């Protein structure tokens, strides 16, 4: 979208109307009609507000391609999307594909770009209508999310999208190999495209720059920040913390995030007798993340299978020394951090202890990490 000769149309389930549209057009799937309704201009304008131009609504209405009157729609003939992960997720994926059929018939475009399995059916639908090339962007696979206990329905949707794709963009070489080996894709159409982070804005820099010098902090803080699911390896973080606390007591551990393993992790910390050194603040967002990273002396990402892993870049950007698992995509491009196997809790404990007690190591990882990211 930064190229002057490129025009982007971004189709999202549920816009709020305050999105930045200076560099792309936004079409809300919740505002795209699939059932013809006889509604006047003023009413459409009042109902849609800043979410969609009424003229676009009418243009889309003219491209309804089938009788969907049996489906539940609102007074504008639109399907409502939650914008979240509801219990009827498969229904929402199918509905998204139906709506995509209207947009694909009305819009003009050269390339279709579908992000992750939730939008693959919509991408396939658009390709079948237009004959335009389909790029699927693999941010993660069910092999990553499930530790190999793959959901066959999800797998089939993922594979179908990849089979129909003209190009498969993977967030790392690690993910690319999974796509080739487990989804049986042609290596020639699979490419690795690593993620990145934006430079910190001034208000975030103001937070980060409040970090206390190493010598002023008698008690060090070690942080895990992410979903508490088996993919992220939270149990290895707690086991490593237990080993660190057998050697020193001037360290506290923060496990920030939420997920289906949260209660299990709280119990594990209690069983190891280290609950008094642990904090479980729950899910964080926005400035809370940077406040947490600013107060952290070590950041640990012990993921069992991480397609990329953006959080280490955010931590290093804040000057927080970082430890990551070798089983992560970001390990392919990051050098000024400590890399180890997720299961090697002895090495993880040694790395945490060393950073917390060696000022030179702390400063090197902090300074070089900022420079590298």
Positions of predicted regions on the chain:
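Conserved donor-binding/catalytic core segment of Leloir-type glycosyltransferases
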Residues: 169, 215-232, 238-241, 366
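Nucleotide-activated donor-binding/catalytic signature segment of Leloir-type glycosyltransferases, i.e.
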Residues: 263-284
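Aromatic "clamp/platform" in nucleotide-sugar-dependent glycosyltransferases that forms part
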Residues: 304
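Short hydrophobic beta-strand element within catalytic cores of glycosyltransferases
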Residues: 321-324
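Conserved acidic donor-binding segment of nucleotide-sugar-dependent glycosyltransferases
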Residues: 337-345, 354-359
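A short, well-ordered alpha-helix in the C-terminal region of glycosyltransferases
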Residues: 347, 354, 361-373
């Amino acid at each position: 979208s930064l190229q002057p000769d490129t025009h982007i149309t971004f189709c999202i389930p549920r816009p709020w109307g305050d999105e930045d549209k200076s560099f792309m057009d936004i079409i809300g799937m919740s505002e795209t009609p699939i059932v013809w309704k006889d509604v006047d201009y003023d009413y459409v304008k009042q109902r849609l507000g800043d979410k969609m131009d009424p003229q676009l609504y009418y243009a889309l209405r003219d491209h309804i391609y089938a009788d969907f009157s049996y489906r539940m729609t609102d007074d504008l003939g639109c399907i409502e999307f939650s914008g979240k992960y509801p219990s009827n997720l498969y229904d929402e994926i199918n509905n998204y594909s139906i709506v995509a059929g209207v947009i694909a018939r009305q819009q003009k475009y050269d390339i279709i770009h579908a992000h992750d399995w939730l939008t693959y059916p919509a991408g396939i639908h658009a390709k079948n209508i237009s004959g335009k090339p389909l790029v699927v962007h693999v941010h993660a696979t069910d092999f990553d999310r499930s530790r190999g206990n793959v959901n066959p329905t999800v797998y089939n949707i993922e594979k179908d999208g990849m089979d129909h794709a003209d190009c498969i963009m993977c967030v790392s070489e690690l993910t690319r190999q999974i796509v080739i080996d487990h989804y049986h894709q042609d290596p020639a159409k699979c490419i690795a495209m690593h993620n990145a982070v934006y430079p910190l804005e001034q208000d975030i820099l103001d937070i980060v720059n409040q970090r206390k010098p190493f010598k002023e902090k008698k008690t060090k803080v070690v942080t895990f920040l992410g979903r508490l699911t088996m993919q992220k390896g939270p149990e290895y973080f707690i086991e490593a913390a237990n080993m660190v606390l057998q050697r020193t007591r001037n360290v506290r551990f923060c496990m920030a995030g939420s997920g289906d393993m949260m209660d299990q992790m709280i119990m594990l910390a209690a069983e190891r007798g280290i609950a008094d050194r642990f904090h479980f603040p729950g899910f964080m967002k926005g400035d809370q993340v940077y406040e947490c990273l600013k107060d952290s002396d070590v950041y640990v990402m012990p993921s069992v299978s991480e397609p990329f892993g953006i959080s280490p870049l955010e931590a290093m950007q804040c000057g927080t020394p970082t430890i990551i698992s070798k089983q992560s995509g970001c390990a392919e491009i990051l050098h000024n951090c400590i890399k180890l196997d997720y299961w090697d809790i002895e090495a993880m404990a040694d790395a945490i202890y060393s950073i917390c007690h060696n000022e030179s190591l702390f400063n090197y990882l902090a300074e070089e990490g900022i420079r590298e990211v």
